[in-house]
Amino acid sequence: MRTMQTITLITPVVLAFMSFIQPAFPQESVPESVVFEKNIEYSNPDDQHLQLNMARPKVGAEPFPAVICIHGGGFRAGSRESFNGLCLQLAEKGYVAVTVSYRLAPRYQFPAAVHDVKAAVRWVRANAAMYQIDPERIGTTGGSAGGHLAQFLGVTRGVKKFEGDGGHPEYSSSVKCVVNFYGPSDFTKSYDASVDAKDVLPLFLGGNLQQQRHRHIESSPLYWVTPDAAPTLFVHGTNDAYVAHEQAEWITERMKAADVEATLMTIDGGDHGFRTSSPEVKTMIDNARLNFFEKHLKK
């Protein structure tokens, strides 16, 4: 029996939605125990030469589990460089961690970004032997728009229509687990609950809810939840002005109904990116992510 848990550090729910704000990870120097490689091309859709950065342990018990890190930015901005610090932290803990670029709106609308992150997972599997990765132990994490894309990976395992043509089609794009930081789950309920959804979503989906209702549904992870979805840790604040805390509640309950493991960690007063949260709360969040990956990716 799969389980659902809720870690409640708060009670009120504040309506909100999506932005360019990203979690702040220290861009520290590369630790002696880590190999850090940048600008590795993983896919080339429409001559875009998509790249990733990779951090991996120099030594340890090979093969290593891997984590795909996906940046936020409202689907129209952001950079993989913002997750370099997280990748270095994960590599110190025994993971091969990659932070990936993907195609952005408005030039590239849904599902281009989904195709790209799935191509990144397939690339990691195709190159597992080269980088001492266990292809059966790949997880993902992301924040805001990146949380949405990470969640989409987790709920569309085996759904061929979203694979795209980004290379290595013989490999699976499935992930074993997801850590979703304040990513939206249902775009059909966003316009009145966010400071910028009316500006962001039409760029990503080709129109507003009235014009493109089908695409709003098709791009919402909530509607793709099945018993095959990956176990997920949701981390969300109650004072998020861009992605409402209730977005995490809805998909947690949907996964519970499908008998999929889901944990909602609610941060009392947490904003989008947890920038105003105390160092103690940020440490607690970091530990929760590591513990979740330890549970699902470490042997």
State each model region's role:
Residues 25-299:
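Alpha/beta-hydrolase superfamily serine-hydrolase fold, recognizing
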Residues 1-9:
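Positively charged n-region of N-terminal signal peptides that target proteins for export
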Residues 8-23:
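Bacterial N-terminal signal peptides
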